[in-house]
């Protein structure tokens, strides 16, 4: 019997946008099983990270509804993520190209790392900025803030 190819990615997946779906679809094309390790709240241990907007159970349900994802497991700490990687022994890890040359949890473990491109143009930050800009534009009393966000988005 041929061994199943298992891929995984990890993150908090707060606001699911088309870029995630493109990434999940591409990942699933190259494996038999695609697993997502879902970070409950990255802000709890790293103050530079934002607290997720969407509750964990809703993020879990959303990810499980995406047909390219076979399994979702929740973790809180980087130690728990490492334990999941060691337990499942995946063949491939999917990481965003922004991690090239950086250290990350489990970078000393066997899974081959495949970096994904952001050529699709989507990011959670961009999505949050777009929502904020639309909200501001609909409230003329804060026009200066809207103009600030527009300039910021043009620079990103």
For each of these PLM feature ranges, what is it?
Residues 1-156:
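Nucleotidyltransferase catalytic core that binds NTPs
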């Amino acid at each position: 019997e041929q061994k199943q190819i298992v891929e995984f990615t990890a993150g908090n997946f707060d606001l699911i946008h088309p870029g995630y779906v493109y990434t999940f679809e591409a990942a699933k094309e190259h494996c038999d099983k695609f697993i997502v390790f879902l970070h409950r709240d990255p802000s709890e241990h790293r103050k530079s990270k934002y607290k997720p907007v969407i509750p964990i159970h809703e993020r879990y349900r959303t990810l499980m509804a995406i047909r390219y994802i076979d399994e979702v497991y929740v973790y809180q700490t980087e130690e728990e993520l490492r334990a999941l990687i060691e337990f499942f022994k995946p063949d491939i890890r999917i990481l965003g190209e922004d991690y090239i040359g950086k250290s990350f949890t489990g970078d000393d473990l066997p899974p081959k790392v495949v970096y994904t491109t952001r050529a699709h143009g989507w990011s959670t930050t961009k999505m949050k900025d777009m929502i904020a800009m639309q909200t501001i534009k609909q409230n003329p009393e804060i026009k200066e803030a809207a103009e600030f966000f527009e300039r910021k988005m043009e620079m990103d």
